[in-house]
Amino acid sequence: SGSCTVKTCWMRLPTFRTVGDFLKDRFDGASRVIYGNKGSNRASRVELHHLEPENPAHKPPSPHDLVYFEKSPNFCTYSGKTGTAGTAGRSCNSSSPALDGCELLCCGRGYRTRTQRVTERCNCTF
């Protein structure tokens, strides 16, 4: 008869790229916090805790901010304690601005360039 008696609604997730970009933006703006003490509630004698920025000049985090308690280990240097191998001695791409680029991978230590000439058989036919 042309009339609609049933409606179906559903929620759809954003694209993976959209979620990734959102999380990366939050990660880049994350701030280190400490566990602060707001005082006590006299009625229940329960201590109320909250997160305070490590740097008092920063604003307190909102419920939507990404925060962290501990600094990340230094992945540039070897550490048996954290199990990080460091980046010394690794090959890097001097023309890449990405994670494999020498500027990021060498952690500001500088790097040596090496030019190689490679001759290979290409099995070309003319």
UniProtKB/Swiss-Prot annotation:
Query: Does the keyword Phosphoprotein feature in the UniProt annotation?
Result: no
Which controlled-vocabulary keywords does the entry list? Developmental protein, Disulfide bond, Extracellular matrix, Glycoprotein, Lipoprotein, Secreted, Wnt signaling pathway
Q: Which molecular-function annotation in GO is an example for this chain? A: cytokine activity
Cross-referenced Pfam families, in alphabetical order? wnt
Which residue pairs form cystines in this protein?
Answer: C92-C107
- Per the record, the coiled-coil ranges are none
Q: Could you confirm whether the keyword Iron appears in this record?
A: no
Q: Which InterPro entries match?
A: Wnt, Wnt1, Wnt_C
Lipid-substituted positions (O-palmitoleoyl serine) = S1
Main location per the UniProt record: secreted
The biological processes this protein is annotated with in GO are: canonical Wnt signaling pathway; cell fate commitment; neuron differentiation
Glycosylated residues (UniProt): N93, N123
SMART domains attached here? WNT1
- Which superkingdom does the taxonomy of this entry point to? Eukaryota
- Gene3D superfamilies xref list: 3.30.2460.20
Q: How is it modified after translation?
A: Palmitoleoylation is required for efficient binding to frizzled receptors. Palmitoleoylation is necessary for proper trafficking to cell surface. Depalmitoleoylated by NOTUM, leading to inhibit Wnt signaling pathway.
The subcellular localization recorded is:
Secreted, Extracellular space, Extracellular matrix; Secreted
Example GO CC term: the record gives: extracellular space
Instruction: Tell me its family.
Output: Belongs to the Wnt family.
Q: Describe the function of this protein.
A: Ligand for members of the frizzled family of seven transmembrane receptors. Acts in the canonical Wnt signaling pathway by promoting beta-catenin-dependent transcriptional activation. Plays an essential role in the development of the embryonic brain and central nervous system (CNS). Has a role in osteoblast function, bone development and bone homeostasis.
User: What is the name of this protein?
Assistant: Protein Wnt-1
This chain's source organism reads Plestiodon skiltonianus (Western skink)
